[in-house]
Amino acid sequence: MIRGEPQEFRDMDNNDLAAMVKAVGNRFGYEDATASYSPMNEFKVKWTRTYKWISLDISDYLDDAPEDVMECLLTTIFRRIAGEDSVEYGQPLVDWLRSEGFVRSKQSLFVRRFRGLSLSTEGKHRDLTDSYRRLIDKGLVEEDPLTYIGWAIYPSTKIVGKTSAIMKVIAISEVLDSEAVSEDVLDYCLYSQLARVKLGFNPGPKRRGIEYDALLDKYPDRRVMDRKLECMNMHI
């Protein structure tokens, strides 16, 4: 498994962002529109607004995004604020977030900010690399050297894992690092999170439960695995 090495990030250019958000904001009727990049654990945009004034707080994972990508992001955000709840992000942004270059340049920073994520696949009793290899050997997943897999050191006792599909980072609950948990169950739990990575960034607000469920159905004896997790008071 390849893990991203720390990358050098240029200083955030809030001046360029301010000029762009002002122009886009004016198109949507805002007399005063401001924005800045901020360090965030997740990829997201927050805003505060009144009738004619708006201020955006944008994740610094976007601080080096090309102009067309930021134009796409801002236009979509303003459209959603205006009530177009179903509008999807445009292709320039989607392509950029799904690119190998984005993951390579941002993943290590994301991992450093991810509280409770182990720096190794090796646990006390299980090694997630072994689980990943079994899934590959069975043809259930394709190997992706960009995917980062670790243990959630401070895990929920009920959820098997947490995943960032954008950053390709998977944290498996440390509760599953036990000899009492079968390899099949552990493999299924890892598969469930790899399925989220496979779906990738969701460009729209609509949930993709049907697509996700279809991927889970490809796992042999999925219903048996679900029942075993229920007996452990855990779920996907």
Regions found by a protein language model. Give the residues of each.
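Active-site-proximal or metal-binding-adjacent scaffold patches in catalytic folds
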Residues: 1-187, 197-236
